[in-house]
Structures are given as structure tokens and as C-alpha cells.
Amino acid sequence: WDSALGACMQKAGARAITGLGVAMPSPFDFIKGIAMAEHKFASIKGMNVRAELHRLTGIDPSRILFTNDAAGFGMGAWSLGGGNARHLIGVTLGTGFGACFIVDGCYATYGPGVPIGGELWDYPFRGRIAEDFVSTRWFEEKFRQITGVAITGVKPMIDYYHADKYTAEVRAIFDEFARTFAEIMLPFVQRFGADTLVVGGGMVRAEEFFFPQLRAAFEQKGVQIPVVAMADTTTAIIAGAAALCK
């Protein structure tokens, strides 16, 4: 972090850096700036990240602000998309399931159609939580169940498909995923009155395998909503984090 921050601050040249926006994965105390994660950034669990960043940069602690990485993604997607959506839902699909609800460019953690805390990863679903059904873990387990082949991540499935191996199995898995993802999202899209759904994260690289089915699942329920892929998730997250300091 020290090296990366130093390089960024050097690029600013003579321009004064008046704030620092940081996007972090949950769980994290975004008010106090305390790391809490067991499995992500475990080496800094309990650390006052705000204090450490102040020590490294000299930036006023009151101007070092934190947000959830999924919230950063949503705010960045809204900004990079021209800010035309009034009610935008952003989701990141990969090793986890991040979500955010954006109202006129602002991150919403409560309100009509917004889940508690504005997050969906732990939303109760089929006796478990939503993340269990839309993360890469689900793909790994489903592919192993069907084919007997162990994989890590989704990319090996795509590679098999392009090598004309397990093509029917891969298609069936993505079809099931699209239906399940639509089932999770539909009530929130409807109650929130979303006019755009933006999808980012590692899974978006496989959009051709599930976006058409996802759109069709929404249309079958009478929901017409643009489903947009944000391939450069990192840039969107950084843009959203930077927006905290405006």
C-alpha cells in the first residue's frame, strides 16, 4: 500500500491532495476505519487503517474516507455511465457477491427496496445465503457434481467449452446460474424501481454465457431493465472511492 500510494501521490505533482477515498470489502468498520475481515486482508484484522494511511500520507484523518468495495463499484458505474440512471443497482460477481443500491449517485443503505445495510451477499435464500448460489464456489461445486472434474474458478469451465469439452454441461450450469441470479435480484429490482442493473467482477468476462438468459428471465416476469456489463470493475471502484472526497 505504501508503495502504491507513493506512486499515485507523485503523479499528482504540485497539485494538493486533499482527501483519500478507500474501497474495502466487508466486513469493515467504515466509520472508524477498522479492518475486521477474517479471510480478506486477514493480516490487518483489527488495524486502524485510517491511522496508518494518515501516517503514510500525512492526509488529514477526517479526509480519509471508506466505503464498501461494491458501493464504490456502484457509484463509479453511475458516474462513468454518465449519471443518467436515477435508481441503479450494481453487483459484483466472483469469489463473493457484492451489491449496492444507488439513488441519484448516492449509496443507499436503507429505503424502499433496499436490503438492510444495502448488501445482498447474506440475503437469506433457499435456506442458506445468496452468495452460496452465485459465487465461484457454486460453479466449482456444480461442475464437480456433474462432471466429476475439480476446477478452481470459472475460467476452466470456459476453457473446456472452447475446447469442445463438456459443452452441454457448461451451458446447463450457466443457464441454472442465470435463473437463480434473476430469482435473487427480481424482488429488489421491482421494489427499488431500478432502471439499470450493472454487473461487474470476474464473472462479467463470461457475460455471453448468462446475460441473454438473465435478460430473458426478467422479461418473462414483465421487467424491462437494461443489464449492463462493466468490464473494468477496478476503474469503477476507484472512481467511486474517489467520489467520496468530492
What are these regions (language model features)?
Residues 1-19, 28-32, 53-62, 78-89, ...:
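ATP-binding/phosphotransfer module of carbohydrate and carboxylate kinases, centering on a glycine-rich
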Residues 25-28, 94-98, 203:
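Short glycine-rich anion-binding loops that position phosphate/pyrophosphate groups of nucleotides
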Residues 33-46:
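A charged helix-plus-loop insertion that forms the helical arch/lid used to bind
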Residues 43, 114-117:
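A short acidic/small-residue loop/turn micro-motif
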Residues 63-69:
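General beta-strand structural signal in soluble alpha/beta enzymes
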Residues 76-77, 100-104, 108-110:
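Short beta-strand-to-turn element immediately C-terminal to the catalytic PLP-Schiff-base lysine
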Residues 90, 97-102:
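Short beta-strand scaffold segments in enzyme catalytic cores
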